[in-house]
Curated annotation (Swiss-Prot):
Belongs to the metallo-dependent hydrolases superfamily. HutI family. It is an enzyme of class 3 (hydrolase). It catalyses: 4-imidazolone-5-propanoate + H2O = N-formimidoyl-L-glutamate. Zn(2+) binds at H76, H78, H246, D321. Keywords: Cytoplasm, Histidine metabolism, Hydrolase, Iron, Metal-binding, Zinc. Fe(3+) binds at H76, H78, H246, D321. This is Imidazolonepropionase. InterPro entries: Amidohydro-rel, HutI, Metal-dep_hydrolase_composite, Metal_Hydrolase. GO terms for biological process: L-histidine catabolic process to glutamate and formamide; L-histidine catabolic process to glutamate and formate. Binds 1 zinc or iron ion per subunit.
C-alpha cells in the first residue's frame, strides 16, 4: 500500500509530456496522487485509480477541490548574510548607481563586513528567519550562495549555515560556493592572487567538508574577468563540481560565452547578452536564469532578450535573487508577476521557470520540480481559480497546505 493518497485535487504537473499549446501547465483535473517513501508512486485522473482509495493507502487526504502544484524552486539566492543595507535604497533613489555604491565600499563589501562579524550561530539565526518566510511563500528547494565572507573562515561559515538550514528546516538546500563574488580589501588590486587563494586554499577545504554542490562567480567589470573566472571553472571541472555564473548584468563582458563553453547549469541576470551568446547557451543546454527582482530594484532599463531565448529554445528560469542590496525578496510568486509585467513572459512560462526549469538549473530535474512518477513528493496546495493565478497576484499568495519529501508540513 502507498503511504499517502491525495484525492479531490486538480493538478498542475509542470510535466513536459502533458504541456501543450492549449495547456502550458500540464493539468490533470479531478486527479489523485499516491505517495510512497517520499516519492510519487502514482498520478493521474482519480477515475483511473487501480482500486478504491481505502484499499490503496494508509492515509487519505482530500484536497477539497483545490489546486496542487510542484513545490517552488528558488535557484538563485544570497540569503545567508548579516547586516542591513536599506539606506542604499535611498541613495539609489537619489541617483547613485550600483557601481558607484560598490566602488566607494558599499554594496557587497558592506555586507561582507557585517557577515564576518557574526558567529556561525548568529548567522544561522538571521538566515533561518528569512528562509522560513520563503518556505511560507511556497519554496521547497532553495539554492544558497556564499560570497559574503571572502575569507577561508567566513566562506566556510556561510556554507556550513547552508547545510545546517537544510537539516533544520523543511527545505531542500543546494549550496553554492561564490567566493568570486567581490574582491576583499585584503587583496586590493590583487585579483589574480585572490583567485589563486580561492582555488588553492578555500575550495579544497570546502570540498573536504562536503559543503559545495556547485561553484559560481561574478563576471563583470566591477568584479572578475572571464580569464579569472575560467581559472575557477577549470578547478571546478577537475573536482567534477558543476558551475554557474552571474554574467552580463551590467555590461557584455564575455561571461556567458565562457559559461556555455564549460556547460554551466545556468547563467544568471543576462540583461546584456546578444544573440551569439544565446545561441551558445542553446547549444550548451544551459538555463537562462532571469532575476526580475534585481532588474526592478535597481531600476535597470535594459531587459534580458526573452524573445531570443524563445527563438533559440533556451530554457528560462526565475529566482528571487534574495539579497540585501539589489533584491530583498522572498516571494517567488511575486517574482513571477514581475517577470510577466517587466519581461513580458507568459504566466505559463513563469510557472515552468520556478518549478521544472528551476530544478534543472540546480541539476535536480530528476529529483524535484514536477509532479511525475518517481519524483520526490514536494507539493503545494493552493486556493486558486487555476495555476494562472499564481503570477497574477503581486506576491502574498501563499499555499494552504505543504508537502515536503512526501510529508505533510504545517505552513510556516
Amino acid at each position: 500500500m502507498w503511504d499517502t493518497l491525495w484525492t479531490d485535487i486538480h493538478v498542475a504537473t509542470a510535466d513536459p509530456a502533458l504541456i501543450s499549446d492549449q495547456d502550458g501547465y500540464g493539468c490533470i483535473h479531478n486527479a489523485a496522487i499516491g505517495i510512497e517513501n517520499g516519492r510519487i508512486s502514482w498520478i493521474g485522473a482519480a477515475r483511473d485509480l487501480p482500486d478504491a482509495p481505502q484499499n490503496l493507502a494508509h492515509k487519505i487526504h482530500s484536497g477539497n477541490g483545490l489546486w496542487m502544484t510542484p513545490g517552488l524552486v528558488d535557484a538563485h539566492t544570497h540569503v545567508i548574510y548579516a547586516g542591513d543595507r536599506s539606506l542604499e535604497f535611498a541613495e539609489r533613489l537619489n541617483g547613485v548607481s550600483y557601481e558607484e555604491i560598490a566602488r566607494k565600499g558599499g554594496g557587497i563589501i558592506s555586507t561582507v563586513n557585517a557577515t564576518r562579524h557574526v558567529s556561525e550561530d548568529e548567522l544561522f539565526d538571521v538566515t533561518a528567519r528569512r528562509v522560513r518566510r520563503m518556505i511560507a511563500e511556497g519554496t521547497t528547494t532553495l539554492e544558497m550562495k556564499s560570497g559574503y565572507g571572502l575569507t577561508l573562515q567566513d566562506e566556510l561559515k556561510q556554507l556550513r549555515v547552508a547545510r545546517a538550514i537544510g537539516t533544520a528546516l523543511p527545505v531542500r538546500v543546494h549550496a553554492t560556493f561564490l567566493g568570486a563574488h567581490a574582491l576583499p580589501s585584503e587583496f586590493k588590486d590583487r585579483q589574480d592572487d585572490y583567485v589563486s587563494h580561492l582555488i588553492t586554499d578555500i575550495l579544497p577545504q570546502a570540498v573536504e567538508e562536503k559543503l559545495i554542490d556547485s561553484i559560481d562567480g561574478f563576471c563583470e567589470n566591477i568584479a572578475f574577468t572571464p580569464d579569472q573566472i575560467e581559472r575557477l571553472f577549470i578547478a571546478a571541472n577537475d573536482l567534477k563540481i558543476p558551475v554557474r555564473l552571474h554574467s552580463e548584468q551590467l555590461s557584455n563582458s564575455g561571461g556567458t560565452k565562457l559559461a556555455a563553453r564549460y556547460g554551466a547549469l545556468s547563467t544568471d541576470h543576462l540583461e546584456y547578452v546578444v544573440e551569439d551568446d544565446v545561441i551558445d547557451l542553446a547549444h550548451a543546454g544551459t538555463v537562462a536564469m532571469l532575476l526580475p527582482g534585481a532588474f526592478y530594484f535597481i531600476r535597470e532599463t535594459r531587459m534580458p532578450p526573452v524573445d531570443l531565448f524563445r527563438k533559440h529554445n533556451v530554457p528560462m528560469g526565475l529566482a528571487t535573487d534574495c539579497n540585501p542590496g539589489t533584491s530583498p525578496s522572498v516571494s517567488l510568486t511575486g517574482i513571477m508577476n514581475m517577470a510577466c509585467t517587466l519581461f513580458r513572459m507568459t504566466p505559463e512560462e513563469t510557472f515552468s521557470a520556478v518549478t521544472r526549469i528551476g530544478a534543472q538549473a540546480l541539476g535536480l530535474q530528476n529529483v524535484t520540480g514536477s509532479l511525475t512518477t518517481g519524483q520526490t513528493a514536494d507539493m503545494l496546495l493552493w486556493d486558486l481559480a487555476g495555476p494562472h493565478e499564481l503570477s497574477y497576484w503581486i506576491g502574498g499568495r501563499r499555499p494552504v497546505q505543504r508537502v515536503f519529501d512526501g510529508k505533510l508540513n504545517p505552513v510556516i
